[in-house]
A protein has these predicted regions:
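Thiamine diphosphate
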Residues: 1-95
Length: 95
């Protein structure tokens, strides 16, 4: 399922220069292929889930469509405040 997700994002990135991938400390594996193909639109930000939400909010405000990926429990619990303040209060489109 992860492979299909990343392959789909890469396929979308090839068609749309505004699509950005933002991840948080995910293993290299098959993501290296995406990083090699579109390095300027591939960000792996380390263990900083709160930061990837803030980064993605800023990218969305500039007209990009960020796809955020990290471990689900960290995304929902560690950065709840950023999701509410950075995304929901200003109504940003984020994938």
């Amino acid at each position: 399922m992860r492979r299909t997700c990343f392959e789909t994002i890469l396929s979308l990135q090839k068609k749309n220069k505004k699509i950005i991938f933002v991840g948080s400390d995910l293993g290299p594996g098959f993501m290296k292929h995406s990083k090699d193909k579109v390095p300027e639109r591939f960000f792996m930000e380390g263990v900083s889930e709160q930061s990837i939400i803030g980064l993605s909010a800023g990218l969305a405000l500039e007209g990009y469509t960020p796809f955020v990926n990290t471990i689900a429990t960290f995304l929902t619990r560690r950065c709840f405040e950023q999701i509410v303040i950075d995304l929901c209060h200003i109504v940003i489109d984020l994938m």
